[in-house]
Amino acid sequence: MLILKFTKTENSSLVAHVDTLRAVTYIFRRAKVDVEYSKGFNPHMELGFSAPISLGIESVAEYVSAKAEMQDDILAKLNANCPKGMSFVALFEKKVNLAATLNRAEYILTANGIGNVIHQVLAPNYTITYTEKRVEVSKDVSSRIFSAEKIDENSAKVVLACGNSNLRPDRIVLHLMTQNNLVGDYKILKTQMFADDIPADEFLSQE
């Protein structure tokens, strides 16, 4: 099984996960990469993705698995067919369920003053409030925050749970901004993923 690491930046960060699946399928077809198809009445490419990210979050660490054989220049062939903001940057061979195994992600958060308040998320029983399906929800998310550190006054780095126990980084940012009266826009960049505490690229390179 091939595992490909790819980016979703600029306009590609505004593409929903289901449309990303369609885009990757199209890219594989255009690049003439021979991927196995599912059996049944509605066959589709056997692709598996790491946990999806919310719209507007840029990423340089997305992963997709494909039941395909290794080919020469496969990254170049794929990248020749990618839309702006999407590119394939690394290739691995490993049989793995990406969504279940890559269960943490690192993000760079950028917003006015967020570096000065990021330490707050490390408080015991840290609770955030957000709106879900028009209902205000409060949850203790402390068990899903693995690290948080200041980069400078206006940026910070966090490692959060993803996958089955996903914690959306935009909810952390918006809660901090609301609680601390921070104004302005914010930006989030996903920089890497982990299999527990092992960086994804290192894990996928292991025999």
Where are these regions (language model features)?
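Terminal, regulation- and interaction-focused segments at domain boundaries
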Residues: 2-12, 103-118
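N-terminal ordered "arm"
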Residues: 12-37
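A short, aromatic/hydrophobic, helix- or strand-capping loop or linear motif
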Residues: 35-42, 89-93, 128-134, 184-186
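Short, charge-patterned binding micro-sites
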Residues: 36-66
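Ordered, amphipathic secondary-structure segments that act as subunit-interaction surfaces
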Residues: 59-109
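Short amphipathic alpha-helices in soluble, non-transmembrane regions
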Residues: 74-83, 117-125, 172-174
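Core RNA-modification/binding signature centered on pseudouridine synthases
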Residues: 123-207
